[in-house]
């Protein structure tokens, strides 16, 4: 599931954009902090969950409302990275897409 703070008026445009990036997953449009939305999404979900965001405040919001979720602070924008504050609650801070995938797989293997 992709949870995005994209206005609902452009929801379908975002879905098309994600499909073009080979990310054909359900999209939920959100407003504001994502912690409460993730809590609602996961209320009947028992498997391991991950939350990945480039916004440290969204990572903290999800961490505060969903202690069992593995929170990941990840940005591919080298211009912004040096100025971003540390994300409270982020247990993974990958440095590349490859590093992200490797660390997520590692978490899943640890849960076996």
Protein language model features and the residues they cover:
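Donor nucleotide-activated moiety binding/catalytic core segment of transferases
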Residues: 24-25, 29-46
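Short amphipathic alpha-helix with an adjacent loop that forms part of the alpha/beta core around
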Residues: 38-44, 98-111
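Short, well-ordered alpha-helical microsegments
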Residues: 10-11, 35-38, 58-60
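Substrate-recognition element of Asp-dependent hydrolases with the DxDx(T/V) motif
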Residues: 1-15, 27-30
């Amino acid at each position: 599931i992709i949870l995005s703070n994209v206005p609902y008026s452009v929801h379908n445009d975002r879905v098309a954009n994600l499909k073009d990036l080979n990310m054909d997953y359900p999209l939920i449009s959100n407003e504001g902090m994502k912690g409460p939305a993730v809590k609602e999404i996961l209320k009947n979900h028992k498997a391991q969950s991950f939350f990945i965001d480039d916004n440290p405040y969204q990572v903290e919001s999800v961490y505060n409302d969903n202690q069992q979720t593995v929170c990941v602070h990840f940005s591919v924008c080298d211009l912004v990275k040096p100025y971003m504050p540390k994300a409270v609650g982020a247990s993974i801070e990958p440095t590349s897409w490859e590093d992200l995938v490797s660390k997520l797989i590692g978490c899943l293997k640890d849960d076996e």
